[in-house]
Amino acid sequence: MGELSFDAPVWHHGKALRKGYTTGSCATAAAKVAALMVLRQHLIHQVSIVTPSGVTLCLNVESPHIEGQQAIAAIRKDGGDDVDATHGMLIFARVTLNDSGEITLTGGEGIGTVTRKGIGLPLGSAAINRTPRHTIESAVREAIGPARGADVEIFAPEGEARAQKTYNSRLGILGGISIIGTTGIVTPMSEESWKRSLSLELEIKRASGLTRVILVPGNHGERFVREQMGVDTQAVVTMSNFVGYMIEEAVRLGFCQIVLVGHPGKLIKIAAGIFHTHSHIADARMETLVAHLALLGAPLELLTLVSDCDTTEAAMEHIEAYGFGHIYNHLARRICLRVMQMLRFTKTPPVCDAILFSFDNHILGSNRPVDEIAKELQC
């Protein structure tokens, strides 16, 4: 596995985490070394590249092979301490020299095919993103000089199987992995890359013609939408903990309606104005419940019981026992109010709705009738 030429760790919660490199860097290095091997007609076992972020990587070459005017080489993906579905797999490049003066880039076995608009690549093309396309072509051009041409094929024998553990199918990328990476470096625990992947799904939904979107924290929300609302899950996008970011992205893309659907354990934080719901950012679930129960006239005994709870589920049991289940409609309206306050400077803010459900998939509350919301989503 390749050695990184940079060794400054990323510190997260007091722990030093090792950086890695992207599939784009692997493909670039594999293409460069394959081109060099064709020209020099001898095997090369180590290659260096400069990533788009300016970091130099010195990577070990695996499975080098030369046959006439064609060479094949592979680089093993190393995500550092940010292990994902592609970690440890081999990314191959096959380079064939010709006299055309042009460099053509294609995707072979295990590289996904683009089947939907919205990710900035032509339909039917290989899922090799713009930055890796540029770095691959530049590396090969540097190796072969200005006059020669080359056919470059990127492939990954494990790609189709590995892709089943990624978001690719939801993004309309079928049959394999994507060759990605804007910096060439994988930063462990990087929220920005995670947020960008979620936003990309929003972009694809909008490009397909959808104008109304349902944002959910995770898979449970999608199941609720399908089973209890009877709405096509094509409209569902995961927001994870990045509530504010995904709402702003939905506004940027021009969605006219945003429906927040989730368990109170996540969504009640929004009622307190918390738009990043990870517990390391903020909690305040019990405080929020206590405050709104008090506004509804709940007795001190219930407020004390809820305040002493460690989980939302435990608090919900007390709320039900005291007959204050109507708090969930109240909280849903408060959530929508907070969202509209966040978007108060938006020229044409979208309609905002909120639906709260229990772990056993029952509707707890909403800002307006769920049937009404579902009907609009089906328009």
Curated annotation (Swiss-Prot):
The record's family statement is:
Belongs to the CbiD family.
Note whether Transferase occurs among the keywords: yes
EC number of the protein = 2.1.1.195
Please provide, alphabetically and separated by semicolons, the GO molecular function terms listed in this UniProt record.
cobalt-precorrin-5B C1-methyltransferase activity
Record's catalysed reaction(s): Co-precorrin-5B + S-adenosyl-L-methionine = Co-precorrin-6A + S-adenosyl-L-homocysteine
Gene encoding this polypeptide? cbiD
Enumerate the NCBIfam families for this protein.
cbiD
Pathway(s) it belongs to: Cofactor biosynthesis; adenosylcobalamin biosynthesis; cob(II)yrinate a,c-diamide from sirohydrochlorin (anaerobic route): step 6/10
The record's section on HAMAP family has: CbiD
Q: Which UniProt keywords apply?
A: Cobalamin biosynthesis, Methyltransferase, S-adenosyl-L-methionine, Transferase
List this protein's GO terms for biological process: anaerobic cobalamin biosynthetic process; methylation
The protein, known as: Cobalt-precorrin-5B C(1)-methyltransferase
